[in-house]
Design a protein with these regions (language model features):
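Bacterial Sec-dependent N-terminal signal peptides
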Residues: 1-26
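Compact alpha-helical subdomains of small soluble proteins
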Residues: 98-155
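HEAT-repeat alpha-solenoid elements in large eukaryotic scaffold proteins
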Residues: 34-42
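Residue-level detector of extended alpha-helical repeat arrays and alpha-solenoid scaffolds
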Residues: 45-48, 76
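Short inter-helical turns and helix N-cap capping residues of alpha-solenoid HEAT/ARM repeat scaffolds
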Residues: 71-72, 103
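Amphipathic alpha-helical scaffolding segments comprising HEAT/armadillo-like alpha-solenoid repeats
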Residues: 30, 57-67, 88-100
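Short N-proximal segments of mature Sec-exported proteins
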Residues: 72-87
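Core register positions within helices of long alpha-helical scaffolds
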Residues: 51-54, 82, 120-126
Length: 158
């Protein structure tokens, strides 16, 4: 008797949880910034960086969490950056939820150098033990095994 009730309860909880995510309403200010940002294509370009700073200033933590699942990779990455900047305690959980976010990439600009990065890679490096300012960044001991898991080099055969 307990098992059908438990299954029903879990299913109902999941259904409510999913419906809340789809019906989540961003504030008017956040919507405007996200709309502007979603037209950009390069992270760290001067235009998109200014929009990121606006997003950091207007979006609540809940909105940023929601935006880490946005359809545009640049919005997902900047929302993740903003959560790192705000020292969101569950930032690693969000990273792990993006382990399979490897289909789309983002263009990243560093001065005159431009490159592409998978969303998962971008988020992983945002938690780098040396360069991240987040309280919840990885330690070197935590970082290295994850790095090896995702980015191990194929050794040439002799």
């Amino acid at each position: 008797m307990k098992q059908p009730f438990l299954i029903s309860f879990i299913f109902t909880t999941m259904l409510i949880s999913c419906s809340k995510k789809e019906n989540y309403e961003l504030s008017k200010q956040t919507k405007l910034v996200v709309e502007e940002l979603s037209h950009d294509s390069i992270i760290f370009s001067s235009g998109s960086w200014n929009k990121y700073l606006k997003l950091l200033g207007v979006a609540s933590t809940e909105e940023l969490i929601y935006l880490t699942s946005h359809k545009k990779p640049i919005v997902r990455c900047y929302a993740f950056d903003a959560l790192c900047a705000k020292d969101y305690p569950k930032i690693r959980e969000i990273f792990y939820s993006h382990e399979n976010d490897t289909i789309e990439s983002v263009a990243v600009s560093a001065g005159d150098i431009r490159d592409r990065s998978l969303v998962r890679t971008y988020m992983f490096l945002a938690l780098h033990p040396v360069t991240s300012s987040s309280k919840y960044k990885f330690s070197r001991k935590e970082f290295n095994p994850i790095f090896k898991k995702y980015y191990k080099r194929i050794q040439p055969k002799n």
